[in-house]
A protein has these predicted regions:
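Metalloprotease/metallohydrolase-associated module, dominated by Zn2+-dependent proteases
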Residues: 2-7, 12-19, 23, 29-30, ...
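Short pre-active-site segment immediately N-terminal to the catalytic Zn-binding motif
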Residues: 28, 47-50, 61-83, 119-121
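Short, solvent-exposed loop/turn segments at secondary-structure junctions
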Residues: 40-44, 60, 66-68, 87, ...
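Active-site recognition of the HExxH zinc-binding catalytic motif
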Residues: 80-92
Length: 184
Protein backbone atom coordinates (compact mmCIF):
# COMPACT_ATOMS: atom_id res chain seq x y z
CA UNK A 1 0.00 0.00 0.00
CA UNK A 2 1.44 3.44 -0.89
CA UNK A 3 2.77 5.47 2.05
CA UNK A 4 0.14 8.17 1.57
CA UNK A 5 -2.69 5.71 2.23
CA UNK A 6 -1.28 3.79 5.18
CA UNK A 7 -3.24 4.07 8.38
CA UNK A 8 -1.47 5.89 11.17
CA UNK A 9 -0.75 3.93 14.34
CA UNK A 10 -3.81 3.95 16.58
CA UNK A 11 -2.16 5.76 19.49
CA UNK A 12 -2.57 4.71 23.08
CA UNK A 13 -5.48 5.04 25.47
CA UNK A 14 -5.35 7.44 28.38
CA UNK A 15 -3.63 5.99 31.42
CA UNK A 16 -5.59 5.65 34.68
CA UNK A 17 -3.54 8.57 36.04
CA UNK A 18 -4.35 10.78 33.06
CA UNK A 19 -8.03 9.91 33.30
CA UNK A 20 -8.04 10.69 37.02
CA UNK A 21 -6.26 13.98 36.44
CA UNK A 22 -8.69 15.06 33.70
CA UNK A 23 -11.66 13.92 35.78
CA UNK A 24 -10.66 16.47 38.46
CA UNK A 25 -11.51 19.21 35.96
CA UNK A 26 -14.06 17.70 33.56
CA UNK A 27 -15.81 15.15 35.79
CA UNK A 28 -17.85 12.72 33.70
CA UNK A 29 -18.29 15.19 30.83
CA UNK A 30 -15.70 13.34 28.70
CA UNK A 31 -15.85 9.79 27.37
CA UNK A 32 -12.28 9.03 28.45
CA UNK A 33 -12.26 5.56 26.88
CA UNK A 34 -12.76 7.12 23.44
CA UNK A 35 -9.65 9.33 23.67
CA UNK A 36 -6.34 8.27 22.11
CA UNK A 37 -2.93 9.87 22.64
CA UNK A 38 -0.75 9.96 19.52
CA UNK A 39 3.02 10.54 19.51
CA UNK A 40 2.96 12.28 16.16
CA UNK A 41 1.81 15.44 14.47
CA UNK A 42 -1.78 15.74 13.34
CA UNK A 43 -0.95 17.90 10.33
CA UNK A 44 0.95 16.31 7.44
CA UNK A 45 4.10 17.46 5.64
CA UNK A 46 5.63 19.24 8.64
CA UNK A 47 2.86 21.85 8.79
CA UNK A 48 2.46 21.46 12.56
CA UNK A 49 5.01 23.53 14.51
CA UNK A 50 7.51 21.31 16.36
CA UNK A 51 6.42 21.94 19.97
CA UNK A 52 2.70 22.25 19.26
CA UNK A 53 0.10 19.70 20.30
CA UNK A 54 -3.32 19.50 18.71
CA UNK A 55 -6.65 17.90 19.60
CA UNK A 56 -8.94 18.72 16.66
CA UNK A 57 -10.93 15.49 16.53
CA UNK A 58 -11.31 14.24 20.10
CA UNK A 59 -7.81 12.75 20.23
CA UNK A 60 -4.49 14.21 21.40
CA UNK A 61 -1.58 14.66 18.99
CA UNK A 62 1.70 15.52 20.68
CA UNK A 63 4.95 15.78 18.71
CA UNK A 64 6.93 12.57 19.25
CA UNK A 65 9.62 14.43 21.24
CA UNK A 66 6.98 15.91 23.58
CA UNK A 67 4.63 12.96 24.05
CA UNK A 68 4.80 11.23 27.43
CA UNK A 69 3.98 7.68 28.49
CA UNK A 70 1.84 9.12 31.29
CA UNK A 71 1.28 12.85 31.60
CA UNK A 72 0.00 12.42 35.16
CA UNK A 73 3.55 11.47 36.24
CA UNK A 74 5.14 14.55 34.66
CA UNK A 75 6.09 17.97 35.92
CA UNK A 76 3.38 20.58 36.35
CA UNK A 77 4.05 22.20 32.97
CA UNK A 78 3.34 18.95 31.11
CA UNK A 79 0.27 18.22 33.23
CA UNK A 80 -1.09 21.69 32.47
CA UNK A 81 -0.39 21.17 28.76
CA UNK A 82 -2.31 17.90 28.93
CA UNK A 83 -5.31 19.62 30.59
CA UNK A 84 -5.20 22.38 27.96
CA UNK A 85 -5.40 19.76 25.19
CA UNK A 86 -8.09 17.81 27.05
CA UNK A 87 -10.13 21.02 27.00
CA UNK A 88 -10.28 20.64 23.21
CA UNK A 89 -11.36 17.00 23.62
CA UNK A 90 -14.12 18.19 25.97
CA UNK A 91 -15.15 20.89 23.46
CA UNK A 92 -15.17 18.36 20.61
CA UNK A 93 -17.18 15.77 22.51
CA UNK A 94 -19.80 18.39 23.39
CA UNK A 95 -20.19 19.24 19.70
CA UNK A 96 -17.97 22.30 19.31
CA UNK A 97 -16.32 22.35 15.84
CA UNK A 98 -12.75 22.39 17.17
CA UNK A 99 -11.09 21.50 13.86
CA UNK A 100 -12.95 24.13 11.86
CA UNK A 101 -12.75 26.88 14.46
CA UNK A 102 -9.02 26.30 14.77
CA UNK A 103 -8.56 26.39 11.00
CA UNK A 104 -10.77 29.43 10.44
CA UNK A 105 -9.48 31.42 13.37
CA UNK A 106 -5.74 30.81 13.22
CA UNK A 107 -3.97 32.94 15.78
CA UNK A 108 -6.64 32.85 18.48
CA UNK A 109 -5.37 34.41 21.68
CA UNK A 110 -4.56 32.09 24.56
CA UNK A 111 -4.82 35.01 26.99
CA UNK A 112 -7.80 35.60 29.23
CA UNK A 113 -8.87 38.18 31.80
CA UNK A 114 -11.20 37.08 34.59
CA UNK A 115 -13.84 39.43 35.96
CA UNK A 116 -17.05 39.24 37.95
CA UNK A 117 -19.90 38.51 35.56
CA UNK A 118 -17.73 36.56 33.11
CA UNK A 119 -18.12 32.84 32.58
CA UNK A 120 -16.24 30.14 30.70
CA UNK A 121 -18.33 30.54 27.53
CA UNK A 122 -17.12 34.15 27.21
CA UNK A 123 -13.64 32.92 26.22
CA UNK A 124 -12.47 31.51 22.89
CA UNK A 125 -11.44 27.86 22.55
CA UNK A 126 -7.73 28.47 23.20
CA UNK A 127 -8.29 30.83 26.12
CA UNK A 128 -10.60 28.19 27.62
CA UNK A 129 -7.74 25.69 27.40
CA UNK A 130 -5.36 27.95 29.29
CA UNK A 131 -8.01 29.03 31.79
CA UNK A 132 -8.89 25.42 32.69
CA UNK A 133 -5.22 24.39 32.82
CA UNK A 134 -4.57 27.29 35.20
CA UNK A 135 -7.58 26.35 37.32
CA UNK A 136 -6.24 22.77 37.50
CA UNK A 137 -2.79 24.01 38.61
CA UNK A 138 -4.26 26.42 41.15
CA UNK A 139 -6.94 24.15 42.61
CA UNK A 140 -5.25 20.75 42.58
CA UNK A 141 -1.47 21.28 42.32
CA UNK A 142 -0.57 24.30 44.47
CA UNK A 143 0.76 25.70 41.20
CA UNK A 144 -0.17 29.37 41.31
CA UNK A 145 3.43 30.31 40.50
CA UNK A 146 3.19 28.40 37.16
CA UNK A 147 -0.10 29.76 35.78
CA UNK A 148 -0.09 30.55 32.06
CA UNK A 149 -1.77 33.89 32.73
CA UNK A 150 0.92 35.73 34.66
CA UNK A 151 -1.39 38.37 36.14
CA UNK A 152 -2.82 35.69 38.48
CA UNK A 153 0.49 34.17 39.62
CA UNK A 154 0.75 36.34 42.72
CA UNK A 155 -2.81 37.51 43.11
CA UNK A 156 -4.20 36.88 46.59
CA UNK A 157 -7.55 35.11 46.38
CA UNK A 158 -7.02 34.00 42.78
CA UNK A 159 -8.73 30.65 43.34
CA UNK A 160 -11.93 32.36 44.50
CA UNK A 161 -11.99 34.46 41.32
CA UNK A 162 -11.42 31.38 39.14
CA UNK A 163 -14.19 29.51 40.95
CA UNK A 164 -16.58 32.45 40.51
CA UNK A 165 -15.98 32.63 36.76
CA UNK A 166 -16.06 28.82 36.42
CA UNK A 167 -19.02 28.24 38.77
CA UNK A 168 -21.40 27.12 36.02
CA UNK A 169 -18.75 24.83 34.49
CA UNK A 170 -17.77 23.37 37.88
CA UNK A 171 -21.44 22.69 38.63
CA UNK A 172 -22.26 21.17 35.21
CA UNK A 173 -19.19 20.48 33.04
CA UNK A 174 -21.27 18.50 30.54
CA UNK A 175 -23.48 21.50 29.66
CA UNK A 176 -23.02 22.81 26.12
CA UNK A 177 -23.67 26.33 27.42
CA UNK A 178 -20.04 26.29 28.67
CA UNK A 179 -18.65 26.10 25.11
CA UNK A 180 -17.09 29.19 23.50
CA UNK A 181 -19.56 31.82 22.40
CA UNK A 182 -22.65 30.24 23.96
CA UNK A 183 -25.32 32.65 25.12
CA UNK A 184 -26.72 32.52 28.62
Amino acid sequence: MPLLFRRAPPGRPLTPGETGMARLVFGDAIDYAAVRVHARAYLPFGLQPPRTAMAPNGHLYFPRACCQDDFSCCDLGNRMWFIHEMTHVWQFQLGYPVRWRGALRIGLSYAYRLAAGKRLADFNMEAQGNLLADYFALRFCDGQHRLYEQRYRQMPGALALFETVLAEFIRTPSARRNLPGRRR
